[in-house]
């Protein structure tokens, strides 16, 4: 059995850990509000752009549709973009995203597709490096705050690969922020743009619009921006989900530390009481012997 000194040291160590987890919980809670506002503010723009694209796509013939909308006519080469956070200590948040990415990569590979991978966030890079191997073509850090610059850089690389004929279909794997307690791993097709399965076309209230320039030219401008917008929106959703998951994980850790402190304190008190009782018995026995 551990000595009283060892037990006191262990209780002190757990208390120190509890202070750290409590502080991390409070920091995550403070950052969550800002991240949640940013994610929610970005949604209407991304949804509106998807609606505009769906409306414009309805007036475009198959031959005149841009490649980012119509595709290359093949689905042999796939690119999977996986977005996680750079840091951990957030429960199973990053693992759930990586698991969804693994399932998609393995499913595509089983179908005989040529799969390549781009990661955003160190956790995705570290966990997928062995699975992807040489198929991991680029890695990016998510950063402490999602930025348009990173989204534009990743978007440019994706579109460069698409225009060069290196990929036919692009998938984005990230975590949708549903609520503080719910973050859902999501797989979304970026290229070709999924207008039919995405947002409904705009309600034009019976009006007929003539576009100048025509729909094809507008889509040629909007579709590249849509890729960037969807990437930025996904990283913002990830950020909110990460802080929510971290806040929950640190709250659980703080509670568990409290339970452990209570258990160790009870054990310490019992051991101390037993030791005192033993010493008293020895003193009484010694006195009686005299």
UniProtKB/Swiss-Prot annotation:
It comes from the Bacteria. Keywords: ATP synthesis, Cell inner membrane, Cell membrane, CF(1), Hydrogen ion transport, Ion transport, Membrane, Transport. Signal peptide: none annotated. GO terms for molecular function: ATP binding; proton-transporting ATP synthase activity, rotational mechanism. InterPro entries: ATP_synth_F1_ATPase_gsu (IPR035968), ATP_synth_F1_gsu (IPR000131), ATP_synth_F1_gsu_CS (IPR023632). It is found in: Cell inner membrane. Its main location: membrane. The keyword Cell inner membrane applies. GO terms for biological process: proton motive force-driven plasma membrane ATP synthesis. Disulfide bonds: none annotated. Pfam families: ATP-synt (PF00231). Gene3D superfamilies: 3.40.1380.10, ATP synthase, gamma subunit, helix hairpin domain (1.10.287.80). It is a peripheral membrane protein. GO terms for cellular component: plasma membrane; proton-transporting ATP synthase complex. Produces ATP from ADP in the presence of a proton gradient across the membrane. The gamma chain is believed to be important in regulating ATPase activity and the flow of protons through the CF(0) complex. HAMAP family: ATP_synth_gamma_bact. PANTHER family: ATP SYNTHASE GAMMA CHAIN (PTHR11693), ATP SYNTHASE SUBUNIT GAMMA, MITOCHONDRIAL (PTHR11693:SF22). Belongs to the ATPase gamma chain family. F-type ATPases have 2 components, CF(1) - the catalytic core - and CF(0) - the membrane proton channel. CF(1) has five subunits: alpha(3), beta(3), gamma(1), delta(1), epsilon(1). CF(0) has three main subunits: a, b and c. This is ATP synthase gamma chain. It comes from Phenylobacterium zucineum (strain HLK1). The lineage of its organism: Bacteria, Pseudomonadati, Pseudomonadota, Alphaproteobacteria, Caulobacterales.
């Amino acid at each position: 059995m551990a000595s009283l000194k060892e037990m006191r040291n262990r209780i002190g160590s757990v208390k120190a850990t509890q202070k750290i987890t409590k502080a991390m919980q409070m920091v995550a809670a403070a950052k969550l509000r800002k991240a949640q506002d940013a994610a929610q503010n970005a949604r209407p723009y991304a949804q509106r752009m998807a609606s505009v694209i769906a409306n414009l796509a309805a007036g475009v013939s198959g031959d005149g549709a841009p490649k980012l909308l119509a595709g290359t006519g093949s689905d042999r080469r796939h690119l999977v973009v996986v977005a996680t956070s750079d840091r951990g200590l957030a429960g199973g948040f990053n693992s759930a995203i990586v698991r969804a990415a693994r399932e998609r990569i393995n499913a595509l590979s089983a179908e005989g597709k040529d799969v390549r991978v781009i990661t955003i966030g160190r956790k995705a890079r570290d966990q997928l490096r062995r699975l992807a191997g040489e198929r991991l073509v680029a890695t990016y850090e998510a950063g402490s705050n999602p930025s348009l610059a990173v989204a534009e850089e990743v978007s440019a690389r994706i579109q460069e690969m698409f225009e060069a004929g290196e990929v036919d279909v692009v998938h984005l794997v990230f975590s949708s922020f549903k609520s503080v307690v719910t973050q859902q791993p999501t797989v979304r097709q970026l290229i070709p743009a999924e207008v039919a399965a995405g947002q409904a076309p705009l309600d034009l209230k019976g009006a007929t619009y003539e576009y100048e320039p025509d729909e094809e030219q507008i889509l040629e401008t909007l579709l590249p921006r849509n890729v960037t917008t969807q990437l930025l929106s996904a990283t913002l959703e990830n950020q909110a989900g990460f802080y929510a998951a971290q806040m929950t994980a640190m709250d659980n850790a703080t509670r568990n530390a409290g339970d452990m402190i209570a258990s160790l304190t009870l054990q310490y008190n019992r051991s101390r009481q037993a030791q005192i009782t033993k010493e008293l018995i020895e003193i009484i026995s010694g006195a009686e012997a005299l």
